[in-house]
Amino acid sequence: MNHIITISREFGSGGRTVGKKVAEQLGIPCYDSELIQKIAEESGFAENYVKEAGEYTPGGFLSSALSNRAFGPTNEDILWEIQCRVISELAEKGPCVIVGRCADYTLQDKAKCLKVFIHADMAFRAKRIVEVYGEREQSPEQRLRDKDKRRAAYHRFYTNMKWGYAQNYHITLDSGELGIDKCADIIADLYKSRA
């Protein structure tokens, strides 16, 4: 059975960067934007649609709960099924790091999975999204709250689990306190000790 690292993260915490650094240290693939591309190929949906709909419930939890599910699966439901299949197939290929997309839930019974959650305080994340992503559309703090709220709603909707809740992960790390590189080192060391 393959050893997989899943990284869930707050927006702006550097989880994607941590995942890439861990993969580099361990010499294994990291799936983030590559995962979006694979899901888009399998589903026939545009990458931008997969990026948005594949991680967020449109309009939040309530509107999704009240959507047209009575008429059959929604595009989001179809995308969820394809996403789960693609994640499972990647995990079967060999050890890897998978960032986001509820991979921790998808792989909970299918792989030896080290489940990680990366978080940081609001000031660290706000500064980071301005510096790294050039976010300037609205206040960085509001953008962080909105993205995190949508991620949490999506995670709860499809997994019935609380996103970011420490008991749902093997380890949670504060990238603002520890730094991106130290988080990557800790995860890589923990992975090696479990292999």
How would you name each of these model-derived features?
Residues 109-131, 137-147:
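Conserved phosphate-donor/acceptor-positioning beta-strand/loop module used by diverse small-molecule
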Residues 84, 180-188:
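Short, amphipathic alpha-helical "lid/cap" segments that border enzyme active or binding sites
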Residues 40-95:
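ATP-dependent small-molecule kinase phosphotransfer cores
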Residues 58-65, 77, 136-181:
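Small-molecule kinase domains that catalyze NTP-dependent phosphoryl transfer to phosphate-bearing small molecules
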Residues 29-40:
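Short beta-strand-centered segment that lines the nucleotide-binding/catalytic pocket of NTP-utilizing
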Residues 1-9, 94:
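Pre-Walker A (Motif I) flank of P-loop NTPase domains
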Residues 103-109:
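RNA pseudouridine synthases
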Residues 6-20:
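Glycine-rich phosphate-binding P-loop
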